[in-house]
Amino acid sequence: MAQLTGSEILAKALKNEGVEDLFFLMGGPMLLAEESCIKEGIRPIDVRHEQAAAFMGQAYSRLLNKPSVCMAASGPGVTNLITGVANAFVDCVPLVAIGGSSPFKTYGQQVFQEIDQLGMMKPCTKWAERVYTLSRIPEMVNVAFQKAMVGKPGPVYLDCPGDLLYEKIDEEEIDWSISGRALPRARPHASSEIIDETIDVLRTAERPVIITGGGILWSDASSELQEFVEKTQIPFYTTPQGRGVIPEDHPLSFMTVRSAA
């Protein structure tokens, strides 16, 4: 009966979620996981500092409108990720951060590079959790992707103890039941009453300006926004997180028509 290591299970689970590219800085205990990702056909993008991996993942997600994955070694590798992860939290970017950690069996004994990585990640993520059993790795990976995308997008963190990554388990014991489950796409709708009230306010407004943020980007509503702008002829301004949803050289761009607003 074939067996898989935790690292191999992690790589296969990421592949099932549609991951094509991985941003990381090689280091233990993630070396086998990173090698396994490459064997699964995931393109490795190795950086010189973990913070760069998180920022590159953030840019990747914004450009492709989908989750990205960054990976780091235990201890200082994970702490180096935090600034990039925190930035993704502020900008509502679905970044999946995966960090190696000291062995689960020796937690609390101050072993090599042991630090409370979960405690540091929780304030700057939507969800942070640790892998406890090999059989549930695919489930945990899918939940991480689900949490990153549901509602307002944002970063998540999955902590992977080194001893679990190198342990083996029979393939038939692995739970793949929700691996690769379709991701939610947040497109919230206002009630008809609020929409009617908004229309009434716009009818009586003298110098309206539309201000849009990153929600337009993540809900994939750029075309709807542009249609609304052009039908109403209301100038628009985008926050830094929402730039590019309508071309900035559009005749109704705030930078172009601000003197008429």
Describe the residue ranges of each PLM region.
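N-terminal alpha/beta PP-like core and its mobile active-site loop of ThDP/TPP-dependent enzymes
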Residues: 1-261
